[in-house]
UniProtKB/Swiss-Prot annotation:
The keyword Nucleotidyltransferase applies. Its EC number is 2.7.7.3. This is Phosphopantetheine adenylyltransferase. It is found in: Cytoplasm. ATP binds at residues 9-10, 17, 89-91, 99, 124-130. It comes from Mycoplasma capricolum subsp. capricolum (strain California kid / ATCC 27343 / NCTC 10154). Substrate binds at residues 9, 41, 74, 88. The lineage of its organism: Bacteria, Bacillati, Mycoplasmatota, Mollicutes, Mycoplasmataceae. NCBIfam families: coaD_prev_kdtB (TIGR01510), cyt_tran_rel (TIGR00125). Keywords: ATP-binding, Coenzyme A biosynthesis, Cytoplasm, Magnesium, Nucleotide-binding, Nucleotidyltransferase, Transferase. GO terms for cellular component: cytoplasm.
Length: 140
């Protein structure tokens, strides 16, 4: 069974994330969406509310499960779930440069883990959780 994890803060989980997840479920038997705190972001909302948001968007996906990561390394969670793959999304060359560091980090922690990158569809590339949060903030 091919098991993967799709980690992120998903604050919020948006159409770009969903686009990557839909691609991943075509290749993997089981995908765990791992919702994590982001230590680099202040005002990180409640993890449970983010999980509920994702549940509403993926209710028709039979091979996807959502879990909360309070404070574990991504590679530790992968091992606990018997996942050999970590899913990441790419929107641009800048994302690629950023992701190389993650790749190196994942491989240094677990040389057996494979990181699989999916490129966002063209119409989803401009989506960013940070931008969506800023828009929501200024709408108030």
């Amino acid at each position: 069974m091919k098991i993967a994890i799709y980690p992120g803060s998903f604050n919020p989980f948006h159409k770009g994330h969903l686009n990557i997840l839909k691609k991943a479920i075509l290749l993997f038997d089981k995908v765990y969406v791992v919702v994590s705190k982001n230590v680099n972001k202040s005002l990180d909302p409640d993890l449970q509310s983010r999980v509920e948001n994702i549940k509403n968007l993926i209710k028709d996906f039979s091979n996807v499960e959502i879990i909360i990561n309070e404070n574990k390394l991504t590679t530790t969670i992968a091992k606990e779930l018997n996942a050999c793959f970590i899913i990441r999304g790419l929107r641009s060359q800048a994302d690629f440069e950023y992701e190389i560091k993650y790749y190196d980090g994942f491989k240094s922690l677990d040389p057996n883990i494979e990181v699989v990158y999916f490129i966002s569809d063209y119409d989803k590339r401009s989506l960013s959780s940070t931008i969506l949060r800023e828009i929501e903030f200024y709408k108030k």
